[in-house]
Amino acid sequence: MINFGIVDNENAQQVYYLLKSIKKNCKFDYTITLMECSKNNPIKNVIDGVKKYTCKYEDANKILREKITENLCILNPNILIKKDFRIEDVSEPFIFGENCYFLPRTDEFKEYKKTLDLPVEIWDGESNYIDWLYKHEHDWKFYYEDFIVSMTTWHKRIHDNATYEALESFVNQKCDYNYKVMIVLAEEEFGKELPVKMKDFVESHKDKVEILWTYKDTRPLKKLDPTIEKYPECPIVTLDDDDILDENDLQKLYIQHMEDPWSVYGSMIDNCYGIEHFDYVCKWVANCRIWPPHCLYNFPLSDFYEYFGGILDDNFNAVRCLYKMTPVKEIKNIQSHKKNDSEIKLTYEYADTDWPNLYSNFIMQHLEELPPDLLYE
């Protein structure tokens, strides 16, 4: 039996993912002690999904101040447990690396005269098991992305300098969190053949950038949906191929997500048209946006073409949030800059589309699916 200790440092989403990975991949007896550090106890009191895990809850200050009655395998919430991780009960305490260390019982800890500050060196004379764990670290843990940045482009823009200026602003952020940039391209358009310029960019940023191929060209919708399918449990930031970010924008956006991980946030927000006799409003966001996991209602792709002209992805996503009762809010301290005339082009497309009637027709055709207790703040 091993007792995992997880310290919640006000990043509820990371702790949630770590708990899920333990449940999925640890095929041995274990217990979990969750130590709350933050004032509002977000894991215990807010995230319902964690309640299905059997955890003991402790105040972090209390457990470190008072006597520790059992060994704890403290895990860094920035990692996940992978594979069928096998572990044996360990009698002697140890500390190693910055991702996993043992917090020993108080009586044992006095013998070692070690601090709990990280990082620390491996203790001399560790057991064979500890040696194995250290050498095979890659077999049982891996880092995960805190969020994914997803964008798409098309054949008339993939060669533009503006596209690569935007991409450089995505990868060169000052951000304390792990993220990856996903460039979604359609096989229908490119046939899995990357232009030389894009191939060179991906190669020069291969630790940060990945190409995601999807067969069908769903135009602007493919900046989000294929990435959601590949990373269903990860928050996703969507950007356009001409968005130029300030160096701290992604950090600001993700911090806002951590404070309110159940809402969609965007740097521009507006109200869609209301429907007569219905007391609600549908909100849509544009520009720099972050989408939490499971925030969109699953409407068929055909609805995007029939009711939204195959171009109004922001509006389609708005009704998908509406039917999932996902709050949609504005983040005010981010303002991405457009590098070309895409906003003008989209404004004309929007003006030429009979959006009010399309929206009204969509709602009337999906009344049975409309949540009865629909509320927006």
Show where each model-derived region lies.
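Active-site beta-to-alpha loop of glycosyltransferases that engages the nucleotide-sugar donor
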Residues: 6-16, 38, 151-165
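A short, glycine-/small-residue-rich helix N-cap motif at loop->alpha-helix starts
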Residues: 14, 55-65, 215-222, 310-311
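Short, acidic, metal-binding catalytic loop of nucleotide-sugar glycosyltransferases
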Residues: 20-29, 166-179
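A conserved acidic beta->alpha catalytic loop
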Residues: 36-43, 185-198
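Active-site nucleotide-sugar/metal-binding loop of Leloir-type enzymes
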Residues: 61-71, 224-235
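Short beta-strand-to-loop acidic/aromatic patch adjacent to the donor-nucleotide binding site
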Residues: 70-80, 233-242
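Conserved catalytic core of nucleotide-sugar-dependent glycosyltransferases
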Residues: 81-126, 227, 244-306
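C-terminal catalytic/acceptor-binding lobe
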Residues: 113-148, 152-153, 157-166, 304-377
